[in-house]
Amino acid sequence: MKEHRAPWECTYAKEDKNKCKAGKKPKSDQEYFEILCLCILQAGLSWGMVRKNWQKYRKGFSNFNISKLAKMQPKELMKSPNVIKNPKKIEGIIYNAKEFQKIKKEYGSFPNFLKSLKQLKDKEVFKILMKRFKHVGEYTAEFYPHCVGYW
């Protein structure tokens, strides 16, 4: 079993959580946010392509700076040559940056938000993540907690 940070290092999370240790816990809200964005951007694409271009995407998305992205408009990001040109994913990332800001106000930090979910059953956690964040479906709602060491 391998402990990892980047989701592309483990493709077993959905099939069998026992094949791969949960990812390392991020050190900041921004790292939690970046990993959520990574899961969103990767959906429907190959991990290899995303991994190969990740530094370019980081640049295009202002290093996933929550404050900067929360203030941006989708049209601004669509102009960047360094982003995946999917309007729904871009809108989702901007919305989710604003949601991370709300979570920080409500809970003090994203890890505190996740701790508040610990007493819930997995399926309830997935539903909360899908409801709270845009462009987070069932697979991402299951995969993301694994990637950030929630399990």
Model-derived segments and their meaning:
Residues 60-132:
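Alpha-helical ds-nucleic-acid-binding substructure associated with the helix-hairpin-helix region
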Residues 55-56, 98, 118, 146-149:
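Short amphipathic alpha-helical surface patches that mediate protein-protein
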Residues 125-134, 143-151:
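Phosphate-backbone recognition surface of nucleic-acid-processing proteins
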Residues 43-49, 100-108, 149-151:
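Short helix-capping/linker segments at secondary-structure and domain boundaries
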Residues 1-84:
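N-terminal polyanion-binding entry modules of DNA glycosylases/AP lyases
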